[in-house]
Amino acid sequence: MKRCITLLSLGLCLAVPMLSQASDINPVIHVTNVHNGQYDAALDAITDIKFYGPYQFRVLKNAIETQGETKDIDGRVFRTSDGVFMHVKARSIDNGSASLDKEVKKIIEDRTVPEPTVKMVLPIKHDVIEVNNDGVRSLLAEFMYGWPLHNRTDMVLVTDYEDTRYYYNLQFYRDKLPEGVRIEQLRQMIMDAQFSYK
C-alpha cells in the first residue's frame, strides 16, 4: 500500500509541471491565409512579379510577354513554351455593373450551359474558391476539361479594387505541365495576385 501511495505521489509530482506548461503551449495547427502577401520562397522560385496599374500578379519565370496576338485581347498576355497562357485585363465598374458574385456566376454559366446555336465543349468539373488578400476579396472560378481539349484547365480570378474590376485568366494542360511545376502551385500563383500600395 505504501508503495502504491509513493508511486502515485511521484506521478503527481511529474504531472503538475507538465500541466502548468500546457497552458503556455500554442496549438500545433495554425489556420492562416497563405495568400496574404507574405514572402513565399517556393512561389518566388518559379514566378516573377508583374504589374498592371496597381494590380500585382505572378507569372511563370520562363513566360514571354506577347502583344498583338489578336485585336480583341487587351491587358498583358504571357505564354510559356509548355502552353501555359496568362492574361490580365481590367475594366471600369459603374452603377450598371454586376456585383463580383454575379459576374463570376455569369462566367460559370457561359462555360457550363450549352448554347443551342453554338457547339460547345463543356467542362467536366468546375469550382469556385474565395480568396482574401490583404482585405481585398477575389473569386476564383476553375474549369477542368477532358477530351477533345486535351486535359485543359482554365482558371479565372476576378477582383474588384476601387472602381476597377480585374481579371486574371490562367490556362494550362494537366498532362503538359512545365517541368517541376504542380497544379497546386499554378493555383497558388494566380491566387497570390494583390495590389501595390505605392
Predicted regions span which residues?
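Bacterial N-terminal signal peptides that target proteins for export
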Residues: M1-L8
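N-terminal targeting sequences that direct proteins away from the cytosol to non-cytosolic compartments
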Residues: L19-F85, L149-H150, E162, N169-K198
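Signature of long, low-cysteine stretches enriched in small and polar/charged residues
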Residues: E109-Y161
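A short acidic-to-branched-hydrophobic micro-motif
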Residues: G75-K106
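Bacterial N-terminal signal peptides
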Residues: S9-P17
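Short amphipathic beta-strand and strand-loop transition segments with alternating hydrophobic
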Residues: Q67, V88-R91, I124-V131
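Sec/Tat-exported extracytoplasmic proteins
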Residues: Q67, V104, I108-K119, I190-Y197
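A mature extracytoplasmic/lumenal domain signature
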Residues: K61-A63, D82, A90-S92, V104, ...
